[in-house]
Amino acid sequence: MNDWQWLKNRLVNAKTKAVSFWLAQTTSTILDIAELIKCCSDLKNTSINGLVDLINQQEKLEFNLTRLKEIDGEDARQLFGIEGNVYKHFQTELSRFYKQTRKHFRETGSESLFLGLPVIEGINEFNDVFRAPLLYVGVKLKVAPRLERFWLEINREEIFLNPTIIGVEINKRNSLFKNNYDTTKVDINQALEIFRELEYQFRMPLTSELKSFSKKAKSDFNTEKRTNFLTNNVLLGIFDVKGDQLFQNFNEILNTDPDVLDELLKDRRDLLYDNREFRENFNLKGTYLFSHLDIFQQYAVKQAFDGDVIIEGPPGTGKSETIVNILVNLALNKKKVLFVSEKVTALDVVYNRLGSFKHIALFNASVASEKKRFYSQFADYESFFTDNFSKKDLVNEMPVFDGQWVDKILSEFTNLQNIYDTQINSGNQSYSFKEILSSFPILDVSYIKIKEHDRFDEWVRVFSSQVWLEKHLTYLAFKAELSKRWQNIDNFYALKDLLEKRKNIRVLCYVLDYFEQNNSIIKPKRVLLYTPTERGQKQLHQLQQDVAKYNSLQRFKSAAKFETIKLNLANKLAQNAKPFFFSWFIQTHAQTLLENLVQTQKQLVKAKQSYLSKIEQYVVSCKRILKATILANFFELYQTNKNELLDICREAKNPVLKEITWWFKKNFALLSKLFPVHIMTFESAALLTPNQRRLYDYVVIDEASQVYLERAIPILYRGAKYIIAGDTKQLKPSNFFQARAEYDVDEEFEDGNVEAAVHSTSLLHFLKNRSRILTLLKFHYRSDSANLIAFTNNRIYNNELIFMNKATADKQVFIVHDVIDGIWRNNRNLQEARDVVQRLEQLTQTAEYQKSLGVICFNKNQAELIEYMIDKQNNPLLNEWRDRVNAQGEYVGLFVKNIENVQGDERDIIIFSLGYDRSVNSYGPISKQGGENRLNVAITRAKQRIELFKTNRASDYNGLSSNSLGSKLLVEYLLYCEAMANNQGESLDFQATQKQAPKAKYELELENQFFNELELIFGEQFTIKRNVNEGAYSFSFVFYFNENPYLAVDFNPALPHSRKEVSENIIYREQFLKKRKWNLVNIWLDEWKLNPGGVLQKLRNCLTHSENEFEEI
């Protein structure tokens, strides 16, 4: 068994840094309201006892700030330590505090707002100094319009005895302790009695008067005397005491089943798993599609079903959409699922994307804050069932996708490749049909008469003979000579015929003598009284010689061959046989191949279109069966547990809503049947569900890089299998026991406590190399401009992301504002903050006001300064911008955050306030270990534009030679922004395009010819660029109109050789282009070569489209 004590120790040590254990002073999220209670509340008995009575008996505590107008001067200094207008001061403080609570709720789903009273302080036996409220009472803060009044609505369902101080004590003692505090009321004496059981004694105050909370340091406590005190302080603030339920769950697990940690965290790697083989053999069979996913998302969904999977989702790669589909797949396979995240925004996004199918999941981000929303889910479900139920829906068969479609497409590509690769033999040489198609000229080859193409080289040799030509000329000359000698050539032929038929010399001589005398040829049968003359014998000899020579020249007599050889010699065919062979083959022997080629290309387009059509139908079918499943879940429970089901559904109509924790646990079994998916925060899951092994079939955890390992143990414990999603290149967890707003001041990064948090092990980092499978999402969708993601893709993700510009992306993607007179002083830059706020006000007067916007600062003080200035301006347009939500109820307002708090956010426009000037050598959290991850999160939030405010030129900042990777990358990024803003981005090396296979010379020549023709015909109307690298992709040609990409052309596209390549490089490349609003057309080289007019018309048709819509052609 492994020793997991280090996990427990880290958990306990982190607890000692929580504001519910040690609170030195009030903060922006914790207010001292003791004097406000005495001066402004409607409480008659303003002692601690009077306040306790009110909490136990009344529903709210009201405050009238206008009473503060009567307090000034010395009273203000004595009561509040404030110079000036007390009323205005508290109006401002209340306004800021109210906004902090709303921001906290948006990010966590829980207000975590409590009254803390009284405060206990001292030193425990382990020398831990503690100072925090003894009791916590949940409240809701309500404010009047002009902040003249506010009130606290008391929630007696959330009363906690300080669980942190107790938890640290019993864990360090390694003892079992049962906290029997009655959480239905506030009882200070009972709370102190619980602490006395742990041997804590407190010196009590002399009176019950409420006291102001003073600032203290740990050094103020005497470690030798160890005196503990109780002070009648009252604090109002954000305290993460509900998160202590996870702490308790963890302790229960460790104490009752310590061996289970070995099982939960064991190395589950499948050493025999071949990811490449999985991708090659991948098909959708058995996987349901709730929406259109890219191929890497489909891989993740398929792999997730086997469980114990890590899904790495870099920024903007569709991680939430992937999770939605995973949840749907698990639900359709009748699995019980718990989906959790630290950020409620991540939960909201997933839940909202379920749309009208949301009844498959039960959503509860906050146990107490959203009762109405929680209970309304059941009433909505009943209405959905009533409106949609039909018994015929219960007999739907599960849809099945034909996994052979990719094979069919690959088969057509293979056929096409085989046709191109067909070897054509000319006799001595062999050529691919593709080369012949690409290179053949239009020549007159009608005179080449051969049946078999493999005899072409032999024909060339025979019909290119200069010797034969000369022999033919000799033949013609000799023939002329014969015609002259024998009066005409016909006489020669007759005499030749006689000579060859008659062997009698006397007869032959007689004929020749007669020919000489009469110039005619006789045919005697016999000669009786004739004696051959000497002349006759000479003529016979001459004839015999002429016939012999004539016969020897007979094979050179062909006039046709003579003309052919003349042509061949004139064309230098022997030296230039290839183009003639190519042209001759295409014209006389290629018909069958060409017909097969055209047919295959048609079949290929048809197969791709069919695949996409089937995918579309499959998504519809999957949604139909999901709807049927939702109805069936309700129907089955209606059949078996009708009364209980209807009671659940009608709970929302009760005037007083029941406590969710009690009600949820009471109905847990029924709710699990009704909703196969439960969506919760970590705290909600710990409070609502039993701390039971394998309570769910799967647990799905999002944003897991920000989750401490020990915090995740109780969630992992509840699941049989896990699916972990996140990004190891983003933020590691910050100390979640501290109020988020109090983390990351620059000075804090100098101490060891926060540095320890930076080195902490997140759930994602710990399990990454222990999970069964690791899968990566690659297609990047968030950034409209490739330049917004190119830097981080190159520097952080090693060019693994697939991205490109949207066809409609703005041209001005980076704007750099140089701040004049900016100075980094007291951890902030005042002038830069002014410039940022001024810019925000400018944008409210433009069309940009309709977009979403976020301001990201590189340290907390700068963020607080900018927020303070915005508050002070009180601009109605800025206020509306800050509060904006979309149609789904998701917060999309203007935010101001530091880099620690923006993971998971995205906005159309991101404004960076760097703050630092060139005098700085360390950039706070960016310069610490993991700073590159912080920078990565910050610079990947923008969808459309980044605006950078900085005081000096990028080259003036220190960091390029720093040992800190974060510092180095920050300065590199500043240089990058400047270059992009000045349209000098091409000088930077951020090549992300996938390598292309080299092209043959003949392919390049044809491509050049095609380009020249495009320029000639379309060049006046469009700008045409060739070999365009666009993000991760390259195109042969791109037509631009008004600098916008109008049409991309893949000329002679590379063919895939595997199923993986078909999916990743063909089908989903084209689908990605569609989502990026690019038009694409494929032009096959044979298409251009054989029918250039048709190709040009095809391009004209594409270019006449009035809108940029993708169309596969």
Swiss-Prot record:
ATP binds at G313, P314, P315, G316, T317, G318, K319, S320. One of its GO terms (molecular function) is ATP binding. InterPro entries: DNA2/NAM7-like, DNA2/NAM7-like_C, DNA2/NAM7_AAA_11, DUF4011, P-loop_NTPase, SF1_C_Upf1. The keyword Nucleotide-binding applies. Keywords: ATP-binding, Helicase, Hydrolase, Nucleotide-binding. Its EC number is 3.6.4.-. Gene3D superfamilies: P-loop containing nucleotide triphosphate hydrolases (3.40.50.300). It is an enzyme of class 3 (hydrolase). The keyword ATP-binding applies. Belongs to the DNA2/NAM7 helicase family. PANTHER family: DNA2/NAM7 HELICASE FAMILY, SUPERFAMILY I DNA HELICASES. This is Uncharacterized ATP-dependent helicase MG140 homolog. It comes from Mycoplasma pneumoniae (strain ATCC 29342 / M129 / Subtype 1).
